[in-house]
Amino acid sequence: MSSCGGREEDRTPCCLILSVPYNTVQPPVVQEVAYAMDIVEQQVAVRKYRFTVEEYHKMGEAGIFSEDDRVELIDGEVVKMTPIGWRHAWCVNTLNMLLARPAQSRYVVSVQNPLIISEHGEPQPDLALLRNLPAGRLPAPGDVLLVVEVSDTTLTYDKNVKLSRYAEAGIAEAWLVDLNSETFEVHSGPGPGVYRRTTRFGRGDRVESATVPDLAFDADDALPPTEPEG
């Protein structure tokens, strides 16, 4: 035990920790040391670096992302977006046409373009209705009337993470289109991380905006066919 060095009373706990078999009853002093080490480990939290929107843009300018990379910034983390399937693409394109019809000069339909919603957040909703196209900058929450997320494989993430961030940013209305259950969820009344009101629409229903006047269409017109044509 001389390898521990120091006086006898100093090296005893060290040697006991190293030599006591895992499945034996540990002496009280070892239990106390182990307990103290466990407390320290619990108190040392793993800290992640959160990129700002400015840093995120500089990464893009530096060529870290290619033009084909589909990424967005959520809570300071660069998140790779899932590939777009035919149902997702069909629904987004159809919604674009349906939302554009009543738009005229009232708002602008933005398709899969970024919004800056916080210092650490730049998501790319599938669609967004903007009051206008801001010059010289990306749209911010004050420019947005509503956002739309079309979900198939990303339902949980879109609902629990992205909609929560839209609510925190104060975006008045957010739609979640669940392609698997063929439903529209219209969320309104943003609060701290959650929308206070939710209205659901399915096949046979007429989808209506909670905040944008005269914005309505039949759900059947926006939901993809059961099987691809051809």
Across the structure, where does each feature detected by a protein language model lie?
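Serine residues within intrinsically disordered or low-complexity segments
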Residues: S2-S3, S19
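Short N-terminal alpha-helical targeting/association segments
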Residues: M1-S2, S118
